[in-house]
Amino acid sequence: MTAAAYRNTLLSLLCLTAGIVDVIGYLSLGHVFTANMTGNIVLLGLAIGKSIQVTVFNSLTALIGFICGVIIATLMVGKAENTLWPSAVTKALALEAFILFVFACLSFYRAFVPVHILIILMSISMGIQTTAAKKLGIAGISSTVLTGTLASLLEDISGRLFFKKQKKTFLRDTVLRALAIILYCVGAIIVALAEPDFYHFIIWVPIVLIFGIMMTAKLKLSGEK
């Protein structure tokens, strides 16, 4: 595999990670999205309209955590070198993995840990991942924001179907966008099947995935321009 192929594969695995984390949050933390802020804002609006205070606080907590994660990652990767895989991206993912590790440990004591602590940990981690993935600049994929990815995918397909000049254009971005959406859904399916019987196993999967991504990036992409 080429260095670019490794990079694209690792980004796709980040989408899988986001799908897993998002559904863990939705099913176990009071029906709140910790990665998909579009859906979370919709839930927030519905909760305000219906005067459901618990959902309002949960959604606001996730939104605040996500914003904090984006700010943290921006400070880490914002001025990083423009290489195939900037070292700052790996450092940001290491911080994300650590935060998810703390979440996983606290999850064993969910009866004693306020749910808002767990929500904010997960949403911070996803905010960090979103900005780190965007730094890679691959087909506009951020790993968590799928609405824009879906729109770009449909534009690609429509252009190839209806405009002759686009029929022979390179398919890489189209394939990556489709793969991002598919893997996000696969992550959601995995958690849906695992909950609740294998909850204490599934929460470690994103950590293992991110660790594997970091190691592969270090071994295969370090120093690549």
From Swiss-Prot:
Pfam families: DUF1275. Keywords: Cell membrane, Membrane, Transmembrane, Transmembrane helix. The chain crosses the membrane at residues 10-30, 56-76, 99-119, 137-157, 174-194, 197-217. It is a multi-pass membrane protein. GO terms for cellular component: plasma membrane. InterPro entries: DUF1275 (IPR010699). It is found in: Cell membrane. Belongs to the UPF0700 family. This is UPF0700 transmembrane protein YoaK. It comes from Bacillus subtilis (strain 168).
